[in-house]
Amino acid sequence: MLTKRIIPCLDVKDDVVVKGVKFRNHRIIGDIIELAQKYSDAGADELVFYDIGASPDNKLLSIKWIQEIAKKINIPFCVAGGIKSVENARAILNEGADKISVNSAALARPDLIDELVYEFGSQCVVVGIDSKFIDGEFKVCQYTGSADKTVQTLLDPVSWAKEVESRGAGEIVLNCMNQDGVKGGYDLEHLREVQSNVSIPVIASGGAGEIQHFIDVFKYTEIDGALAASVFHDDIIAIPELKQELFKNNIPTRIVK
């Protein structure tokens, strides 16, 4: 049985780590390299770095810190933000990232997924889906890194997840925007709905506030990993303690000694 992954998320803006609530009102958390080292040493299974200003501002993320992170940590990490081409992705992977993640650019031009998969393989290509419950239904949103530039698309998350898989992506991160930063728990029903319609790994994002939320998302859905930010940044949850509790609840996880 594959172990379930615990994945701290570091939202990056202007080369520092920030965190908002429901993708808004971001506060500065700290230094990218120091936090990456902290979470790697604590036993995280992967890290995800989102340059949240890159896509809304139509720029490529800053890659100057990627190589340094690759030197400092010994776990896989994924980089996202402003990736619009094979060339953008290659620059990031060449600096030492293990995966790249696309979101808004893939919505604007879905063929980008096919091109990235052809060039680098499915194992390197993650697609983020920002899903928001609006007027009684879930819709995929675009350019969510900026409040005044966020766009609600006509796509529903299940249909888009199916297309993402059909184009060869190796993994989906489902960001439940209504839960983001409020620490009320993952949206188990929505996660189940999307995950049950695809066969590639799905990572839960948005809502973690306590250890029980991680236990619940692994017990009551078939997702492969749980991404979180605030609970780790604010030292609400320590990763070693979280993993011990998952182990006690018969959830397969990698224990770092």
Swiss-Prot record:
One of its GO terms (biological process) is L-histidine biosynthetic process. The keyword Lyase applies. It is found in: Cytoplasm. Pathway: Amino-acid biosynthesis; L-histidine biosynthesis; L-histidine from 5-phospho-alpha-D-ribose 1-diphosphate: step 5/9. GO terms for cellular component: cytoplasm. GO terms for molecular function: imidazoleglycerol-phosphate synthase activity; lyase activity. Keywords: Amino-acid biosynthesis, Cytoplasm, Histidine biosynthesis, Lyase. The active site is at 11, 130. Its EC number is 4.3.2.10. SUPFAM superfamilies: Ribulose-phoshate binding barrel (SSF51366). The keyword Magnesium does not apply. Its main location: cytoplasm. It catalyses: 5-[(5-phospho-1-deoxy-D-ribulos-1-ylimino)methylamino]-1-(5-phospho-beta-D-ribosyl)imidazole-4-carboxamide + L-glutamine = D-erythro-1-(imidazol-4-yl)glycerol 3-phosphate + 5-amino-1-(5-phospho-beta-D-ribosyl)imidazole-4-carboxamide + L-glutamate + H(+). InterPro entries: Aldolase_TIM, His_biosynth, HisF, IGPS_HisA/HisF, RibuloseP-bd_barrel. PANTHER family: IMIDAZOLE GLYCEROL PHOSPHATE SYNTHASE HISHF, IMIDAZOLE GLYCEROL PHOSPHATE SYNTHASE SUBUNIT HISF/H IGP SYNTHASE SUBUNIT HISF/H. HAMAP family: HisF. Heterodimer of HisH and HisF. Belongs to the HisA/HisF family. IGPS catalyzes the conversion of PRFAR and glutamine to IGP, AICAR and glutamate. The HisF subunit catalyzes the cyclization activity that produces IGP and AICAR from PRFAR using the ammonia provided by the HisH subunit. This is Imidazole glycerol phosphate synthase subunit HisF. It comes from Francisella philomiragia subsp. philomiragia (strain ATCC 25017 / CCUG 19701 / FSC 153 / O#319-036). The lineage of its organism: Bacteria, Pseudomonadati, Pseudomonadota, Gammaproteobacteria, Thiotrichales.
